[in-house]
Amino acid sequence: MHSSALRDRAARFVVDSDPGRLRLRSAAGTTLSLVLAIIALLAFTRFTHQPVTIAMLGAIVAMQSSVAVKDKHQRDRVITTLLLPLPAVGAVTLAAILAPFDWVADVGFIAVLFTAVWVRRFGPRGNALGMVAFMSYFFALFIHATPAQIPILAAAIGVGIAATLTVRTMVFPDRPRAEVLHLVRALRGVSITVLDAVTKDRKKHDLVAVRRRLDRLGETGLMIDDWLDRHDAAQTLSVTSDELAVRVFDAQISVEQLAGLLWNLDSGDEWTGGLVDAIIALRMCLQDKPSEEELRAARKSAAAAADRAEMSAPGGVATVVAYRAVQAHLAIHHITTNALGTATTSEPEPATPTDEATSGLDPSTKAAVQVAVATSAATILGELISPDRWYWAVLTAFLVFTGVSTRGEILTRVGHRIVGTIAGVAAGVLLATLIGQNPPAQIIVLVFCVFCAFYLVTVAYAWLTFFVTVVLAMLYGLLGNFSVQVLELRIAETVAGGAVGIASAYFVFTTGTRATFIEKANDYFDRLTEVIDAGVESVVAPGGETDLVAETRSLDNALQEVVKTGKPLQMGPAVRSRRGAQRLVRGLQAGNRSAHALARAGVNAARADPESAPPEATAVALRKAADHVCDTVAGVKKMVAGESANAPEKPTTAMLLEVMTTSEIPPGPVRAAVRALNNLDRTLTEVTSRV
């Protein structure tokens, strides 16, 4: 029993930390591409009597081509992969020709780095082509490639990319049905963890755990929305994409609302039998493979509990919300169990061109100039530290700009890289001592570290650096060149490269962290206002069409950008500023769940009969209350920008009370909208008072 519980806990951890197994799939694909490339290239070098360094280049290209290609659709990913030999062979050729001319080769390297960043303006394909060109030039210098070796190096590149293409199209092809089933299973798994956080040991609730699990629930919902952007649900499941989006939205929001209601129940009071029955029924629906009999019993039990619920009591409201969650997850069970057996990949819709014009230099050009300056300085510093290992400083100066743009993000990235390098050196020395000259064991550790590096890279960049450093230690051991002094040089070169990267970020086309944070926050507040307006209009005019689900997902994506750009501010040296950023982000995350509830009220109203519209007086009062909440949003927006905001003349609570007194309002979208507006306003008001 104990081992079974441990297995269940481990399985739940994997599902929670990697919804849909996307990280597992990506890391496994990269590792398998590397292994296939190494096997093929070792055979190739043995047959052609070439040094093992030739195999190293092909293996690195295979790994990089697996990691760097991130086009949204499978067809685009294959096309990008097929294009990769062009920049790879071109970069190797340039490096081999320029290598005899010391400083000219350095200038060529910096030119390649500049171009690799500049082409990011062309989206994922440009980024992939640039990264592969950079890595190819780098390793051509590393192995001291000569012009005579260009044909054999080109062949090694072809073998490496062929290995990646084989894995991408044959071992891990695009499987829309399997992917969405994993994501839906993850949605259920995360929903159970949310329930556990608010139902088990009620007297010792862990608020941090509840927030973390609710955030994970929202992230899983966005992952399903991303799947819907890439695939047509009608070709894989028994519903259209719009219908699945609504079902998932219902399931997510109902669990969020239920968690909030259960959290606010008095921990000293016993729950009513109806609420307990509804929670048990919901747990049954959240199991992976319940039988049809179990699902029917869960529906019947939850419906009976909702019929008996006293809506004037908080426990009664929670019971009804639990029943709605049961209905939502039952619908998803029906959709996934009736999924079609096969699916054809739909052609991606062409991107809609935008007319937005940006002033000044393109961000990719600014970043390219920053990288050129940083890598030029890193070349000089790196050669002063070690004429043979200078490229590590250049590598660090380049990589700290990958995927980030603000000063704070780059500073954080440098910190992660230095910490990961130091820890990796320590681990590499320890493993080298324990393993010794044992090629099979060294190869196993090397492959394991590659998998861990790319499985954990999205958790923290330090993990990638840590495992890559261990890989280098194993690689030097295999080549017979391992020494502690070499790894110590890596630390020094990493620090030097990180330092010039930070200097370049602060003094060359600097992008302020706070300014970027304010920009992202303003975008979020604008989208929040749109959701408030659209939700209230749908409630006061039921039975119409609404795009609230898509608008809410856009709101969630905007919030993710706020959280991402706010992370450096939450780790700053100033205690007051750090805590203010933390409270603001937490407040926006809490308020976002109230916006979800309002959007759900609007979606439910859109399904209702137009005759169920509230009286005109109620509609007018609700619109006024919504305008008042929008004013509160505007006040928070001013506060974030450092401006002063005027206090409202009339409390929002009083205006919402006027809505309820205009007529006898039965349970339904209007009440749900009033409750959501009240919670949203209260949360945002608390943000302004505490930040």
Tell where the protein language model's regions lie, with residue ranges.
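Secondary-structure capping and boundary motifs in well-ordered enzyme cores
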Residues: L86, R247, V419, A423, ...
